[in-house]
Amino acid sequence: MKKNYVDFSSAYKAIGKTEKQFKQAAVKAVEAGGEYASRYLRVKTPVDYDTKTHMRDHIVYSKPTVNKPVSEVGFDKQVAWRAHFVEFGTIKQDPQPFIETTMKDIENKVANIIQSEMMRRMK
């Protein structure tokens, strides 16, 4: 009697390899998006020439990992505490909403960067 079976081990290995490649591509794509966002935020951040420490010089972004494929863009600890004063204003300072407008400006561009990176890496 003949046994009818199909060996799927090679298919499972290929799926596992593709999944690993997809995760690595996602990390690289998100990193590219975060890098673009940090550069654009640097351009849009207002500068006060009366101070020596400029927020523009303290923009950072986190590197994504396979477990956390997210890149957070913002200011380092040295100037982050005062970013909201510029964004929302104070009693004596008018608001300069650069963070919110930057997010709105680059939302579609960052999505396109991530999508094109994923497509390029998954070919």
Residue ranges and their predicted role:
Residues M1-K123:
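Short, Lys/Arg-rich flexible segments
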